[in-house]
UniProtKB/Swiss-Prot annotation:
It is found in: Cytoplasm. Signal peptide: none annotated. Keywords: Chaperone, Cytoplasm, DNA replication, Metal-binding, Repeat, Stress response, Zinc, Zinc-finger. This is Chaperone protein DnaJ.
Length: 383
């Protein structure tokens, strides 16, 4: 059985991201195989790295908290068999750069792997979309305009003038890094920094593309059509693949994430898949019953008010709520709360009729005059 990730890092389940990071750094220093030569230190370090990778990522941590290991679906990188790249570090010297201010090669004189200057994935973008109440319920299509980086069509992302190509950086020999040996309390380390000549790519563009000035990407305003699924709610996030920024040096684009907010409705209130609203009826409609037309998200709907309806009665309109995302044929309900309106003013004839009705029912009628007596008289009809 897999060990609990929180126990692995010796933190509580409500630990903050900073607490998790602090705990990981402390334990990683202790168990890193370049420092700790004990048998099992490397396996422990792998477990620590995997625990940190999961718990430092909000989405993965939420899935783990809810479903445990099953919630990760095998998709979490840097597992026990994946030493390189664990916890977001490119290799062993990456983590030492993080811990020891840019020193690597703990006394081993080891050569760090060259960072490739090839294609890299573009950045994801965020777009905040405000929907009307009923747009969120029934979905549809909307056009939005975004500004993003696209691959330069002239150089196809290389940054070089057509017919030419990037040259190996002479300053770093194509490694993308420059090194300097330093002695520290931990032993002999190599200080590693990105090459200032090629910015860490290992390549230099000597003949820049005239269209993008060597950047390989250009800014563009694009209008795209978004399909909004029925049933989205405030806080929903939609993903549009490939509409983020183009990657560097011809790499694949990132994604566009659309964060949804929904305007309030003057009549309806939503809770999950259900809709709530209030309708007013007269005291006579409550006593005698009636049919009335009420507003729903589908339009006017006739409802039956049964005789003797009490104040605050809730009627259920089955299947008139919000469609379920992914299964729009299944919908929640619409709950209609009835408010019985008692008149504050009454004509002499109506008052006389109500008095006779009260006597016929054998109910005491208030002798009070004016509004106070009227309210008492009508109130007795509901008891």
């Amino acid at each position: 059985m897999a060990r609990d990730l929180y126990e692995t890092l010796n933190v509580s389940r409500d630990a903050s991201k900073e607490d998790i990071k602090r705990a990981y750094r402390k334990l990683a220093r202790q168990y890193h195989p370049d420092v700790n030569k004990d048998a099992g230190a490397e396996d422990t370090f792998k477990e620590l790295s995997r625990a940190y990778e999961v718990l430092s990522d909000d989405d993965q941590r939420a899935r783990y908290d809810r479903f445990g290991e099953a919630g990760l679906n095998g998709g979490v990188g840097g597992g026990p068999g994946d030493f390189a790249g664990a916890a977001g570090f490119g290799d062993i010297s990456d983590i030492f750069e993080s811990f020891f201010g840019g020193f690597a090669g703990a006394g081993t004189g080891g050569r760090r792997a060259t960072r490739p200057g090839g294609p890299t994935r573009g950045d994801d973008l965020r777009y905040d979309m405000v929907l009307e109440f009923q747009e969120a319920i029934f979905g549809g299509e909307k056009e939005i305009t975004i500004n993003h980086l696209i691959t330069c069509e002239t150089c196809r992302g290389s940054g070089s003038k057509p017919g030419s190509g990037p040259m190996t950086c002479r300053n770093c020999g194509g490694q993308g890094q420059i090194r300097q040996a330093r002695r520290t309390p931990f032993g002999l380390f190599t200080q590693v920094a990105a090459c200032p000549n090629c910015q860490g790519t290992g390549e230099v563009i000597e003949s820049p593309c005239p269209t993008c000035s060597g950047r390989g990407r250009n800014q563009k305003q694009t209008t795209i059509k978004i399909t909004i699924p029925a049933g989205v709610d405030a806080g929903s996030r939609l993903r549009v693949q490939g509409e983020g920024d183009a990657g560097m040096r011809g790499g694949p684009p990132g994604d566009l994430f659309i964060y949804v907010s929904v305007r309030n409705h003057p009549v309806f209130r939503r809770e999950g898949q259900d809709i709530y609203s209030i309708a007013e009826i007269s005291y006579l409609q409550a006593i005698l019953g009636s049919q009335m037309s009420v507003e729903t998200v589908d339009g006017p709907q006739t409802v039956v008010v049964p005789p003797g309806t009490q104040p605050e009665t809730v009627l259920t309109l089955d299947g008139k709520g919000v469609p379920r995302i992914g299964n729009p044929t299944r919908r929640g309900n619409h709950y209609l709360q009835l408010k019985v309106v008692i008149p504050t003013k009454l004509g002499a004839e109506e008052r006389e009729l109500l008095t006779k009705l009260a006597k016929a029912r054998g109910e005491k009628v208030s002798k009070k005059e004016g509004l106070e007596g009227l309210i008492d008289s009508i109130g007795n009809l509901f008891h």
